[in-house]
Regions:
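Non-heme di-metal
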Residues: 1-103
Length: 103
């Protein structure tokens, strides 16, 4: 784990962490990472839904709508995993939010 390299830094607060604290840190870091995947999938859902709205041809709308359903399944899977298996869902990263807001 890259954070363990801080053990050698003089005065580092992580120098006193025991194994349980490192496990807690790893779980929270994983939860934060998966939360960003969830928000990314929510952004993809939004983008594909807008595509359905934007294209003028009915066949293109049908095709794009299948992608909307796929993205909705991804959102559902990540949300369920975070709710059932992880300790928290973190808010969207400001940089990711900025990208999604530009769409």
């Amino acid at each position: 784990m890259p954070a363990r390299s801080l053990l050698n830094v003089k005065g580092s607060p992580v120098a006193t962490w025991d194994d349980d604290k490192w496990v807690e840190f790893a779980v929270q870091a994983q939860s934060a990472s998966l939360s960003q995947f969830l928000h990314g999938e929510q952004g993809a859902l939004l983008c594909t839904a807008r595509l359905v709205e934007a294209v003028p041809w009915i066949d293109a709308k049908y095709y794009a709508a299948t992608q909307v359903v796929d993205e909705a399944r991804h959102v559902e899977a990540f949300a369920r995993y975070l709710d059932e298996k992880m300790p928290a869902t973190y808010p969207i990263n400001e940089n990711l939010k900025s990208l999604i807001d530009q769409v």
